[in-house]
């Protein structure tokens, strides 16, 4: 089966933005104008096509990135048909993982800003993520009909706060309630969209007289930006003072793809103005799969290889999202980088080193699907029937194995205990958690050995709220949720020698176990070491493992506050036994008693987990952020300058002091700072804190 759309007419783009910039509404308009949906779905009605989870329709925010395929011939039908694969992504800080994994598989992005609130904190986070993956992007300044909307101010913020060279290719005609349309700064014409047919038709008109001078000035800036693409263009521009429309477009396209400039458009998706012009700009300026560098990977001999966007190259794809569908089971969203994959054929998962079979391949339109016979280089689709694939795995041709660049996922930062409300919920909960963890790499599940509770960890409180909500709705599991917890540890600080003796002799067969142990502290992270120095058979060899086992059991239960003991070396150097009464159980108990007695004499200490915290904040709030970290017993490790005038603060802070930090940081910096944290080490807890914890658990 031949390719229906040539690869140079593909655009794989993401629509990314801050919460509430109007991103999902923009996507809805795109689907309406490209003919995919006949009725526009509004977010505030809970009817948006791409928000298909119940939680999203209730909360009015986008949680998972839905992939949608659509076609576009241009506002004026000026193009041959182009195929646009769009990924709509969430803008909430707890879901940055979704944005990250979408950007990883896209070739370009449309970043939506609100015309009145401009560059917001989450926009800074998203922008940095796009910088990390070098994604070419353009800007749509939306909500120009809103009170306080100001296109020039937003363009200025993009330049100063995000450090981008922003080049407007449109300017607005009026703003707020007076917003009428836009001026195309390349054609130098005004565009008015009809209000009778939801903006389906439009007309080109002359630029209003009062805006002519400003439009001429902005046109000049745009032509200069285009001329900088090459020496030839610059020479022509200096000689003639102008460039042709085609030359301008080709030059701006090249500079956008090279990440040198960011083009800006404006409009109001809700008022049906400007969205088709965004689609035209996507086709004109954002890259096709063949315009971006070929993806790199590692072959089975650990050599670096490339996979070009070519149907004739060996098949290679990246699984970038797993979703559970109520009708077909597990959907694995894949981005095909090279080659062709037919439904029903076999693939090799090079990360898991397993062969898999693809049952069916479907093209997703938010929540609906069309069956496909095959997918080719540049396609984004969902595969059904893959058994053991997780986000970030590479699927490839068995004869040409490759592992594509892995995605890096942040460590979860918050943990809560969940308990099923009834026995019936117990089994369902295990299945639900396993499925949810397969879908979301930033969500973890484990069992606490001390309390046997199920612990779930994620990227924030909203993240875990939604997980618990999904367990209830999708899997029918009712559960109780505990408070966030910290996991402490214990260790010793000095060396002791101690006797452990267990004797029971009351007529008949007794119990006798007798050991001498030396306990020594080890360096941080060294774990547990057991050494047998018994000579001359004072303890028979078959009882030695029982002593070790008894010590390890006592270590798990701790000696101060029932937390596990870390970093200890125990040497068994003497002891005695009884011909009749000694057995394994007696020596196990003797080992356990000896360790407990010795650890209490060896200057025991309570350890608390300390986190490596990195805060990104605008310079204005640096003093407040540092002061707050100091109040949380944080040690400031250093500070750096980030892109776009932000400061990076590196600190080490005890986990116990970090609960509620996301909320506090948001309010202290008006939501403009973001942070990440990961586990660093266990350190001695201060005496007053250790004392309170030990008393609360005794």
UniProtKB/Swiss-Prot annotation:
According to the UniProt entry, its GO molecular function terms are: GTP binding; GTPase activity; guanosine tetraphosphate binding; translation elongation factor activity
Q: Which SUPFAM superfamilies match?
A: EF-G C-terminal domain-like, P-loop containing nucleoside triphosphate hydrolases, Ribosomal protein S5 domain 2-like, Translation proteins
InterPro entries with a match to the protein in the record: EFG_II, EFG_III, EFG_III/V, EFG_IV, EFG_V, EFG_V-like, EFTu-like_2, G_TR_CS
GO CC terms:
cytoplasm
Q: Where is the tr-type G domain?
A: 8-290
Q: What subcellular locations does the record give?
A: Cytoplasm
> Which Pfam families does the record associate with it?
EFG_C (PF00679), EFG_III (PF14492), EFG_IV (PF03764), GTP_EFTU (PF00009), GTP_EFTU_D2 (PF03144)
BP terms from Gene Ontology:
ribosome disassembly
Positions contributing to GTP binding: 17-24, 88-92, 142-145
UniProt keyword annotations, A-Z: Cytoplasm, Elongation factor, GTP-binding, Nucleotide-binding, Protein biosynthesis
Q: Does the keyword Transmembrane helix apply?
A: no
- Which stretches are transmembrane? none
What is this protein's function?
Answer: Catalyzes the GTP-dependent ribosomal translocation step during translation elongation. During this step, the ribosome changes from the pre-translocational (PRE) to the post-translocational (POST) state as the newly formed A-site-bound peptidyl-tRNA and P-site-bound deacylated tRNA move to the P and E sites, respectively. Catalyzes the coordinated movement of the two tRNA molecules, the mRNA and conformational changes in the ribosome.
**PANTHER family the UniProt entry points to:** RIBOSOME-RELEASING FACTOR 2, MITOCHONDRIAL, TRANSLATION ELONGATION FACTOR G-RELATED
Q: Which family does it belong to?
A: Belongs to the TRAFAC class translation factor GTPase superfamily. Classic translation factor GTPase family. EF-G/EF-2 subfamily.
Output this protein's name.
Elongation factor G 1
Coding gene?
A: fusA1
């Amino acid at each position: 089966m031949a390719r229906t759309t040539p690869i140079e007419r593909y655009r794989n783009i993401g629509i990314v933005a801050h919460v509430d910039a109007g991103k999902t509404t923009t996507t809805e308009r795109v689907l309406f104008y490209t003919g995919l949906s006949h009725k526009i779905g509004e977010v505030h009605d809970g009817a948006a096509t791409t928000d298909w989870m119940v939680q999203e329709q209730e909360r009015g925010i986008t949680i998972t990135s839905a992939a949608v395929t659509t076609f576009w011939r241009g506002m004026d039908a000026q193009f041959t048909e182009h195929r646009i694969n769009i990924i709509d992504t969430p803008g909430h800080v707890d879901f940055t993982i979704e944005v990250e994994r979408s950007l990883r598989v896209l070739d370009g992005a449309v970043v939506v800003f609100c015309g009145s609130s401009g560059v917001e904190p989450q926009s800074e986070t998203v922008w940095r993520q796009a910088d990390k993956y070098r994604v070419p992007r353009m800007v749509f300044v939306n909500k120009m009909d809103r009170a306080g909307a100001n296109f020039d101010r937003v363009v200025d913020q993009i330049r100063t706060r995000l450090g981008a060279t922003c080049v407007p290719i449109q300017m607005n005609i009026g703003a707020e309630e007076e917003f009428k349309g836009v001026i195309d700064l390349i054609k130098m014409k005004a565009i008015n969209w009809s209000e009778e047919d939801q903006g389906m038709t439009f007309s080109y008109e002359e630029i209003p007289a009062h805006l002519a001078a400003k439009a001429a000035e902005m046109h000049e800036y745009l032509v200069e930006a285009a001329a900088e693409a090459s020496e030839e263009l610059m020479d022509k521009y200096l000689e003639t003072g102008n460039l042709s429309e085609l030359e301008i477009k080709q030059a701006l396209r090249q500079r956008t793809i090279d990440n040198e400039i960011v083009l800006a458009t404006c409009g109001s998706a809700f008022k049906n103005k400007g969205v088709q012009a965004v689609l035209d700009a996507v086709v004109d300026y954002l890259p096709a799969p063949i315009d971006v560098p070929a993806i790199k990977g590692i072959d089975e001999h650990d050599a670096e290889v490339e996979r070009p966007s070519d149907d004739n190259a060996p098949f290679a794809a990246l699984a970038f999202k797993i979703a559970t569908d109520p009708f077909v089971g597990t959907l694995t969203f894949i981005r095909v980088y090279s080659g062709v994959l037919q439904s029903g054929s076999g693939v090799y998962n090079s990360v898991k080193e397993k062969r898999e079979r693809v049952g069916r391949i479907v093209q997703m339109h938010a929540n609906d699907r069309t069956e496909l016979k095959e997918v080719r280089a540049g396609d984004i689709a969902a595969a059904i029937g893959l058994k053991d694939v997780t986000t970030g795995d590479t699927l490839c041709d068995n004869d040409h194995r490759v592992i594509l660049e892995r995605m890096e996922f942040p460590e979860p930062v918050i943990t809560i205990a969940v308990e099923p409300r009834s026995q019936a919920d117990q089994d369902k909960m295990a299945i639900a958690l396993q499925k949810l963890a397969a879908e979301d790499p930033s969500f973890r599940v484990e069992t606490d050995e001390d309390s046997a509770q199920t612990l779930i960890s994620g990227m924030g409180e909203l993240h875990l709220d939604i997980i618990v909500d999904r367990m209830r709705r999708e899997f029918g599991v009712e559960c109780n949720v505990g408070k966030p917890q910290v996991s402490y540890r214990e260790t010793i600080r000095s060396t002791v020698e101690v006797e452990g003796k267990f004797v029971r002799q009351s007529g008949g067969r007794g119990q006798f176990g007798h050991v001498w142990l030396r306990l020594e502290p080890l360096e941080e992270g060294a774990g547990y070491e057991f050494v047998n120095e018994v000579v001359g058979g004072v303890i028979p060899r078959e009882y030695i493992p029982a002593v070790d086992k008894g010590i390890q059991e006592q270590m798990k239960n701790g000696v101060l506050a029932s937390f596990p003991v870390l970093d200890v070396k125990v040497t068994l150097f003497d002891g005695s036994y009884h011909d009749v009464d000694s057995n394994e159980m007696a020596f196990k108990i003797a080992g356990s008693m000896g360790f407990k007695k010795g650890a209490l004499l060896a200057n025991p200490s309570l350890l608390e987990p300390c986190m490596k915290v990195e805060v990104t904040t605008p310079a204005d709030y640096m003093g407040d952020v540092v002061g707050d970290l100091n109040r949380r017993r944080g040690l400031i490790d250093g500070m750096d300058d980030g892109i776009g005038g932000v400061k990076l603060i590196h600190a080490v802070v005890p986990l116990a002091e970090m609960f509620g930090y996301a909320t506090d940081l948001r309010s202290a910096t008006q939501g403009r700072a973001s942070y990440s944290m990961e586990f660093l080490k266990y350190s001695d807890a201060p005496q007053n804190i250790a004392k309170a914890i030990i008393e609360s658990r005794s």
